[in-house]
Amino acid sequence: MTGSTPSSSASPSSSRPPSASRRSRRRTVAALAVLAAAAVTAAFALTLDDADNREEKAGEPAAVTASAAPAPADEGLLALARRDASDPLAIGRADAPVVLIEYSDFQCPFCGRFARETKPELLRSYVDKGTLRIEWRNFPIFGEESEQAALAGWAAGRQNKFWEFHDVAYGKPRERNTGAFDAENLVAMAREAGIADIERFQADMASDEARGAVRADQEEGYTLGVTSTPAFLVNGRPILGAQPTDTFEEAVETAATAAKTANTTEGAGR
């Protein structure tokens, strides 16, 4: 299982939690309090091989050790699903029985692997059939280009082109912090994604609203204990790194079955 950790050259906002955002959603306050007490270590931190990470060369992909058994779902984590039908950074029915939350960085090579190899399978097998909803969270950890790419993704969403931009950005492996996500290339990606109003795209990228939205996503991830990308929650069950596709399929199937059982039990109790 593999993921990426920030390099030592990452900007301060990408290497440690940003300050509290006024835009943090009130609906998750109680859930995050639960997470701070229990899920932070149980959900993500214990899946990291801390010793290996300390020995690793800065900027190289972080080795991740899988748990012997799947981590259980957590009620606080379940509450993080936004289920906002108008969210342009989400795909799938808002009332889908399973929600996968993804914390990713556009410069993360393992996020790219997930986007190219696993996500298309999940879309075909579960999203298109109404079983799964995928909600994106911007989690830039590799410096200025990561942050600019996150802002660009948010701006693309303002014109309902986030997923098109996502597919272009992850369309091929790109070297980190080499200009692949500089201003000129981000505009080129926006054009390729079919974004019509480039001036609006650039203005949205530079807006305080964009920075606030990205910061709120980062804060959510940091509160969970996320330190590398990609990281996922499948109906509250944590998965860290670019696991094989069947790992995600198993998680979705298990979550869908549990949701169906819960609905049946709830209906019988009425």
Name each model feature, range by range.
Residues A68-D84:
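Short coil-to-helix leader/linker segments, especially the first N-terminal amphipathic alpha-helix
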Residues A81-V98:
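A short beta-strand-turn-helix
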Residues A85-P88, K119-E121, D217-E220:
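A generic local structural motif
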Residues L89-I91, F181, I239:
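Short clusters of hydrophobic/aromatic residues that line enzyme substrate/ligand-binding pockets
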Residues E102-D105, V226:
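Processing junctions and N-termini across compartments
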